[in-house]
Each structure stands twice: as C-alpha cells, then as structure tokens.
Amino acid sequence: GIRPTQGMVKQAIFNLVGPRIEDAHVLDLFAGSGALGIEALSRGAAGVTFVDHQVRGLAILRQNLDVLGLKERSHVVRGDVVRWLEASPDQVKRAGLVFLDPPYDDVVLDQALRALDRTADDVTVVVEHSRRHEMPALARLQVDRERRYGDTIVTVFVAPAVESSTTP
C-alpha cells in the first residue's frame, strides 16, 4: 500500500536537511503520495522530480500538486526507481537533495543506493529505513548523520563535489 511518512519522522528529516533545500533540485524516490517532495517545494526547492511505480500513489500525488499549485516545479515519473536512476545520470547529477524512502525492501534500497553512489556529485541523500537494515558499502556517499525513531532510522549521506579534471 501507500505509506505516508509519519509526521514525527518527516519533521525530523526536514530539521536535518533544512538549509540544503532552498533552490535545490530534489529527487523524491519511491515518492508514494509525495509528502517529502511537496514539503521540499513548500520550503523553497527549485523543483522536484517524483519517481514511483505505483499508479494509485501517483494519481494522488498529481492531484495534490494540482490543488497546491505546484505542478510547474514538479516532474512526475512513473517507473522503476532503480532503472530510472541508471537511465537518468544527468538528472541525478543535477540533484542537490535526494529522498529515498522505499517500502522496507532491503534489496531495492541497496540497489537504489548503489545507483545513486555511482553518479553522486555534491548531493545530500536522506534514507528512511528499518533499524535492522545493514547499509551496503558505498564509494562516494558517506554517512553524515543518523537518527533513530522507534524501528525507523533516518540516515543522511553526503557526497562531495566531483573534482573537474580540467587543469589550468
């Protein structure tokens, strides 16, 4: 089903990444009804790309964006998150902030994190996951902060900017 992010956890997420939202391009992956991306838009994000494969959740999301007048700054993609990440490296590189809130499916979470890790460039990635989940080893994404709320853990990863290879 559709899992709205609980209010307390959502509040905590925005307390952790507040300053990074302004003018950022945001990816809301496994978006569901889009609670995290919509909140980011309301806090000054330049734009949000919502990606999910569930038709029902996306219908609700589109309706919410319409009612709130946020369609102009939104792009809704219906599709498999991991495949989309692998097929859209430019859009991933442009993102300054990524919300990753998959159904508690460890395999999908790890695949999405690894796909993000391959293209991560000057980005903050916020992952909501079960406290039982062991994070995979990642090359670029480094754990910045972690908060626990019952059985849910919010992990914030950061990846530094990729150094340009041009020499003066």
Locate predicted features.
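Class I S-adenosyl-L-methionine-dependent methyltransferase catalytic core
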Residues: 1-168
